[in-house]
């Protein structure tokens, strides 16, 4: 193992770097540094040699050239096991650099600002940093490359335990992380530049929503026993910077390892329950809600959601948007479930659920956030779209019927509309008093989804008198309205936009139904 005797430290993210440098110095490591990093370390009283003094060549061109020098890169790239390299380095007065600690200019943060000019973006493209990172990573057998401040404590511990040396395996892991770091950095630059309006070479160019070259990087969280089916291999990857409050932030408190289907269903349940301001419970089966309700507390919300479809809830995923207490867990564990999700659980609740060792229990921070893009693979390519995060307010709704909805109906219509967004198309949702009363999902014809929702309500013994209906897309014919009217439902919310809208509107008036248009469609496939 190579003993670390000289380190070059030059970082944009200075979190923890002072303590790291102090520990290296205490181990007798000679520190080289540049710019703001050197200033920080010197002001802290650490012995530091500026790279310009080490190379005998000043920083120049507004800092664009700092470390691009043979004495730096020769010291990083030289192989200690090749006599020719050792002799050449000695001939030219090039000393070994055994550790490189570098992270890069904050390019992504810079271009995230909509007012960022092309000039600002270009000036935040790091040149010397990635060059040193790649050089050190290439020569990982002899040089340690540190790009992540989270690694500082463990590296210091290993250096102290091994007389200032890092194991070969450690250096290799650091090199893999380094190349991942530079790949993501270059990908971000490519994404930005290829998103600029064609022909614009200055100022603040207009950006297109989707770059001509889409670079994305994900980190593997876990391998899975299998995928959607046992004959399929699978793994779960997260974004480098996952959306706030997303499934990628889950903390598993107990239970078996999450499966591919568990994560897909848990994501559907969690994204749905997060959209409600009131205390809510969502039960999901095969990525479709089979019961949703709001209530004064989690127990009430669960009982109402479960009552929608007790059969489909078997083996489902249950999500809450409030902390879960012991009484709720007592009720929930009375059914067979795969996953239970909430922002938190009381200690009493955890003790009760612990008896159900196979139940997977997840805590996820209740925060707002959405993926920048949604990706769907197709043969030979990928479909990319922005996420469906559109909600409608009262002021956006348009009543097109003679009958106006009552205040309670309007409240239920907005509730049903939120639920419908998370049901696979064609989606029909019946609701009453903040509870789903019947859900028809995934049918090829809208009227069939309507009939299924009606049958589900009948099977559950739920009265549809005074209930409302939501449709994720327009009614292409009046038949869906007629079936809804047969159930005694007197208010419907839907996007509108069919070529037969007038026929549909007339059917609503014929049945005395209040018909509300959103102007927004929520297809989900």
Swiss-Prot record:
Comment on protein domains: The IMP cyclohydrolase activity resides in the N-terminal region.
Any one GO BP annotation for this protein: 'de novo' IMP biosynthetic process
PANTHER family: BIFUNCTIONAL PURINE BIOSYNTHESIS PROTEIN ATIC (PTHR11692:SF0), BIFUNCTIONAL PURINE BIOSYNTHESIS PROTEIN PURH (PTHR11692)
Enzyme Commission number, as recorded: 2.1.2.3, 3.5.4.10
One Pfam family recorded for the sequence: AICARFT_IMPCHas
Pathway assignment: Purine metabolism; IMP biosynthesis via de novo pathway; 5-formamido-1-(5-phospho-D-ribosyl)imidazole-4-carboxamide from 5-amino-1-(5-phospho-D-ribosyl)imidazole-4-carboxamide (10-formyl THF route): step 1/1; Purine metabolism; IMP biosynthesis via de novo pathway; IMP from 5-formamido-1-(5-phospho-D-ribosyl)imidazole-4-carboxamide: step 1/1
Swiss-Prot/TrEMBL catalytic activity: (6R)-10-formyltetrahydrofolate + 5-amino-1-(5-phospho-beta-D-ribosyl)imidazole-4-carboxamide = 5-formamido-1-(5-phospho-D-ribosyl)imidazole-4-carboxamide + (6S)-5,6,7,8-tetrahydrofolate; IMP + H2O = 5-formamido-1-(5-phospho-D-ribosyl)imidazole-4-carboxamide
Domain called MGS-like: residue spans: 1-147
Family: Belongs to the PurH family.
UniProt-recorded name of the protein: Bifunctional purine biosynthesis protein PurH
Species annotation: Chromobacterium violaceum (strain ATCC 12472 / DSM 30191 / JCM 1249 / CCUG 213 / NBRC 12614 / NCIMB 9131 / NCTC 9757 / MK)
GO MF, one example: IMP cyclohydrolase activity
Record key words, sorted: Hydrolase, Multifunctional enzyme, Purine biosynthesis, Transferase
Domain of life of the source: Bacteria
Lineage, highest ranks first: Bacteria, Pseudomonadati, Pseudomonadota, Betaproteobacteria, Neisseriales
Annotated GO CC locations: cytosol
């Amino acid at each position: 193992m190579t003993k670390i005797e000289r380190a070059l430290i030059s970082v944009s993210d200075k979190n923890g770097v002072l303590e790291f440098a102090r520990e290296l110095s205490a181990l007798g490591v000679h520190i080289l540094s540049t710019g703001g990093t050197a200033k920080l370390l010197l002001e802290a009283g650490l012995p530091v040699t500026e790279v310009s003094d080490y190379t005998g060549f000043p920083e120049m061109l507004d800092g664009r050239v700092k470390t691009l020098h043979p004495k730096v890169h020769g010291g990083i790239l030289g192989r200690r096991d090749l006599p020719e390299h050792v002799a050449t380095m000695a001939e030219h007065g090039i000393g070994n650099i055994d550790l490189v600690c570098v992270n890069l200019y904050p390019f992504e943060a810079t271009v995230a600002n909509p007012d960022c000019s092309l000039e600002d973006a270009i000036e935040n493209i790091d040149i010397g940093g990635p060059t040193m990172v790649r050089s050190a990573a290439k020569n990982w057998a002899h040089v340690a490359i540190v790009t992540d401040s989270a690694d500082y404590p463990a590296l210091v511990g290993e250096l102290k335990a091994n007389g200032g040396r890092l194991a070969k395996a450690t250096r290799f892991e650091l090199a893999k992380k380094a190349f991942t770091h530079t790949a993501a950095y270059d990908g971000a630059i490519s994404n930005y530049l290829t998103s600029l309006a064609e022909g614009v070479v200055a100022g603040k160019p207009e950006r297109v929503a989707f770059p001509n070259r889409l670079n994305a990087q994900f980190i593997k969280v876990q391998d899975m026993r299998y995928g959607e089916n046992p004959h399929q291999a699978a793994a779960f990857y997260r974004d480098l910077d996952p959306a706030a409050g997303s499934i990628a932030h889950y903390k598993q408190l107990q239970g078996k390892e999450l499966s591919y289907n568990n994560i897909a269903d848990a994501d559907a349940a969690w994204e749905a329950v997060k959209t409600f301001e009131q205390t809510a419970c969502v039960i999901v089966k095969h990525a479709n809600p089979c019961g949703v309700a709001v209530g004064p507390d989690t127990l009430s919300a669960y009982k109402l959601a479960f009552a929608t479809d007790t059969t489909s809830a078997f083996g489902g995923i249950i999500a809450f948007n409030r902390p879960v207490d012991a009484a709720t867990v007592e009720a929930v564990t009375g059914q067979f479930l795969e996953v239970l999700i909430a922002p938190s659980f009381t200690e009493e609740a955890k003790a009760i659920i612990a008896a159900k060792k196979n139940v997977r229990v997840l805590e996820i921070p209740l925060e707002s956030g959405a993926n920048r893009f949604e990706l769907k693979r197709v043969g030979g390519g990928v479909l990319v779209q922005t996420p469906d995060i559109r909600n409608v307010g009262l002021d956006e709704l348009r009543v097109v019927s003679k009958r106006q909805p009552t205040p309670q109906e309007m409240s239920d219509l907005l509730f049903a509309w939120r639920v419908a967004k998370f049901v696979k198309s064609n989606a029909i949702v019946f609701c009453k008093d903040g509870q789903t009363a019947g859900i028809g999902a995934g049918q090829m014809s809208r009227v069939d989804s309507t009939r299924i929702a009606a049958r589900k309500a009948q099977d559950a013994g739920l009265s549809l008198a005074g209930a409302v209906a939501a449709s994720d897309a327009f009614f292409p014919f009046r038949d869906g309205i007629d079936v809804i009217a047969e159930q005694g439902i007197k208010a419907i919310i839907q996007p509108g936009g069919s070529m037969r809208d007038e026929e549909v509107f007339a059917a609503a008036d014929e049945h005395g139904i209040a018909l509300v248009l959103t102007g927004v469609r929520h297809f989900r496939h």
